[in-house]
């Protein structure tokens, strides 16, 4: 099977128009006519990940976070991104990224988190009024426009966040410990612990602070996400339990989503979940 067939399968599952307007999901590096020798699935593409792909005989890397995000002005040896690009090109390794299109897809990143927390059929939110997109970023570049990189503007994305209902209410401290255990997180940053039980849980992998008002309006008892701006913690004690577990920790099971899509849609393609830990943050 050719790399382009794997790419097409991934984009059927998480169409590129689902990505935010500032994103750069899709093909990053390489030629897609080559036969797939193996697909290495990862959260981030680093030099170590490329080395692992070589070692494990994979000529395709599928990541969640794009390697090429803010654009390259040169391909030399000035930083880790440039070195990673050069290494992948030299070794004829194709790099594909499924980022906010996978975040926003039905059965994507947030559904996987819900599955980890014990619910396989979480609810998607009702259509929300227009608001800003996830994060702050510059407008599309001419090259992105030429490649058809678009966002969905103010339309609701099906998986931008999801709501699950726990089988039984949990005391807040027990809930936080449960999330840490299920998501393999070392710690969690929270606001004041709730005095009432938690049962309705909103989920957004990665940086989800832009959704806080939405999940409160939807009646969530708790909000599990990967990043939260300091000032967002203020003013919500006893209104909602904020549970921030780290960007990497909230998304590192995304490789299982990618694996399931490829194995279902591209039978015979060998999938390897990367063993390289690319989390740049260390808790000391």
Short names for language-model regions:
Residues 1-284:
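Hydrophobic structural segments
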């Amino acid at each position: 099977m050719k790399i382009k067939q794997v790419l097409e399968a991934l984009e059927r599952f998480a169409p590129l128009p689902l990505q935010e307007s500032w994103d750069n999901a899709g093909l990053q590096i390489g030629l897609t006519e080559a036969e797939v020798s193996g697909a290495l699935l990862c959260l981030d593409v680093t030099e170590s990940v490329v080395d692992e792909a070589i070692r494990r005989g994979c000529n395709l890397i599928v990541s969640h976070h794009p390697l090429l995000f803010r654009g390259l002005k040169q391909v030399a040896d000035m930083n880790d991104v440039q070195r990673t690009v050069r290494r992948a090109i030299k070794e004829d390794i194709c790099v594909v990224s499924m980022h906010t299109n996978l975040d926003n897809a039905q059965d994507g990143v947030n559904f996987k988190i819900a599955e980890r927390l014990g619910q396989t059929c979480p609810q998607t939110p009702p259509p929300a009024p227009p608001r800003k997109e996830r994060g702050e970023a510059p407008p599309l570049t001419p090259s992105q426009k030429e490649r058809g990189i678009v966002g969905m503007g103010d339309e609701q994305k099906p998986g931008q966040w999801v709501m699950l209902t726990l089988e039984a209410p949990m005391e807040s401290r027990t809930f936080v410990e449960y999330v840490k255990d299920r998501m393999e997180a070392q710690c969690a940053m929270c606001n004041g612990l709730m005095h009432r039980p938690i049962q309705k849980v909103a989920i957004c992998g990665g940086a989800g602070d832009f959704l806080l008002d939405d999940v409160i309006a939807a009646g969530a008892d708790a909000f599990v996400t990967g990043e939260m701006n300091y000032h967002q913690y203020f003013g919500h004690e006893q209104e909602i339990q904020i549970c921030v577990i780290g960007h990497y920790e909230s998304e590192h099971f995304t490789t299982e989503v990618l694996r399931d899509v490829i194995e279902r849609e591209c039978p015979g393609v060998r999938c390897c979940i990367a063993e390289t830990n690319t989390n740049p943050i260390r808790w000391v």
